[in-house]
Structures are given as C-alpha cells and as structure tokens.
Amino acid sequence: MKNLCSMVEISVEDFNRAKEFYESILEIEITEMNVLDTQIGMFPMEEYLNLGCISKCDQHIPSKNGTLIYLNADNNIAGMLKKVISAGGEILTPKTKLGDQFGFVAVFLDTEGNRIALHAQK
C-alpha cells in the first residue's frame, strides 16, 4: 500500500467561515457541492490519494479531542502558522522538531474548533 490515507474530511459548523479559512491558509480554491444533505467543499485534487474536503452535516461535530490529521506545510510551517493567526485560528503547539528523521510539526485550532496539525521535513 503506497499511502495509508486516501481522504480527509474536516467537519465544520460554519461552512463559509471554514471555506475562507482553509482557502486562506492553504492558498487553494475549494469547490462546493452538496451530497446527501451534506454541504461539502472539495480541496483541489492532483492525485486521487491526496483527496480532502470540509463538510457541514448535522451528524458531524467539529472537535479538538479526536483524531489528529496532518496537512502538508510544504516546508513552510512558520509561514502557514502566520496565515492561521491572520485567518482567525489559534496556535496550540508551535513548530516542533520530531527527532532527526521525521521533520517538524505544529498544531492549530481552526475557526470551527478542530485541532489540525501541519507537517514539513524542514
């Protein structure tokens, strides 16, 4: 198996606020759609294995206490953390080294109350 994760779905309460937040920090354009009464915002897809979205659904509740996903910071964690603050997020863990082999991570709280991590090799 090449990649263990095939899709990431981030639950949101305020779809427009979350869309603006993630478009700002990731510098992407989110495509909106509705599927089975769920408002979905798809991240751009270059490869099938890099699929992600935000979703607003009554059954999904944003949380900082559950699974932690790591977004690719493209070797610019410091720059992305600045964007997180500008877009209304909160830094929970600043850029931290994961030993000599695994790069760096940081953790933030998004505008919806989700705990999200960033990862980069440098």
What would you call each of these model-derived segments?
Residues 29-64, 115-120:
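Conserved short beta-strand elements that form part of the metal-binding/catalytic scaffold
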Residues 3, 5-13, 31-35, 42, 59-85, 104-109, ...:
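Vicinal oxygen chelate
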Residues 25, 49, 90-93:
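Residue-level signal for pocket-adjacent positions within structured domains
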Residues 16-17, 38, 49, 75-79:
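Short alpha-helical
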Residues 7, 11-43:
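N-terminal first-folded block
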Residues 1-19, 47-49, 67-69, 122:
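N-terminal beta-strand motif that seeds the catalytic metal site of vicinal oxygen chelate
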